């Protein structure tokens, strides 16, 4: 399938893109201000709790990104439409970045809270595996010269790697871990204050 974009469409996208970049940057700065500087310290953990405002969204986005990657791989297998390869290839580095941010901010928070930078906790280990899955997906695309072969092998990895997503999500329920249980559940109201959730 050949996707053709006219010059006027490209100019329109470039114009909209600059507005999106500026608005995203401003919203990001405002969000960081309110979450890291304006929010009150936790009554137990103090100021170290503020890093959760970066850690938790990064972890959620890393799981969401891999879910999009896996869905794109499945749809590519069914339709062989190259746009879905492009979706998966494009979101892999974004997901890897969010996973790395979640791992690093979790370690920064873990040092004063748990007393160590890293423990081989079920959720931590499965998040580290997710980071390696992202890296493997990216490296497969870059190391295999034949694009059709790279697409097939990468799609298989993307689909099989999705098994790790429910393991990450439910690891706190299945095993005795240092992480707290889920604060958002389908069966009950969230245990986190609604103002903090928003």
Language-model segments: which ranges?
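Hydrophobic alpha-helical membrane-insertion segments
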Residues: 154-170
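Alpha-helical transmembrane segments of multi-pass membrane proteins
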Residues: 25-43
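Non-cytosolic membrane-interface motifs at loop->transmembrane helix junctions
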Residues: 46-53, 113-127, 150-154
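Membrane-interface helix-boundary motifs at transmembrane edges
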Residues: 13, 78-90, 144-150
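N-terminal membrane topogenic signal
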Residues: 8-24
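Membrane-interface helix-loop-helix modules in multi-pass inner-membrane proteins
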Residues: 94-139
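Interfacial helix-start motif at the membrane-water boundary
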Residues: 52-66
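Membrane-interface transmembrane-helix boundary segments in multi-pass integral membrane proteins
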Residues: 56, 176-198
């Amino acid at each position: 399938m050949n996707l053709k974009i006219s010059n006027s469409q490209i100019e329109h996208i470039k114009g909209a893109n600059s507005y999106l970049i500026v608005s995203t940057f401003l919203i990001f700065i405002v969000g960081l201000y309110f979450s890291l500087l304006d929010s009150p310290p936790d009554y137990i953990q103090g100021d170290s709790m503020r890093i959760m405002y970066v850690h938790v969204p990064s972890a959620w986005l890393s799981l969401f990104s891999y879910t999009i990657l896996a869905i794109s791989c499945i749809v590519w297998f069914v339709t062989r439409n190259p746009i879905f390869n492009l979706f998966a290839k494009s979101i892999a580095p974004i997901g890897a970045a969010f996973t790395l941010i979640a791992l690093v901010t979790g370690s920064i928070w873990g040092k004063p809270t748990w007393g160590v930078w890293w423990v081989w906790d079920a959720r931590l280990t499965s998040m580290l595996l997710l980071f390696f899955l992202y890296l493997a997906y990216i490296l497969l695309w870059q190391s295999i010269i034949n694009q059709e072969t790279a697409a097939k092998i990468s799609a298989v990895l993307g689909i099989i790697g999705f098994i790790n997503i429910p393991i990450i999500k439910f690891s706190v329920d299945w095993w005795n871990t240092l992480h707290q249980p889920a604060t958002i559940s389908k069966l009950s109201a969230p245990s986190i204050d609604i103002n903090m959730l928003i």
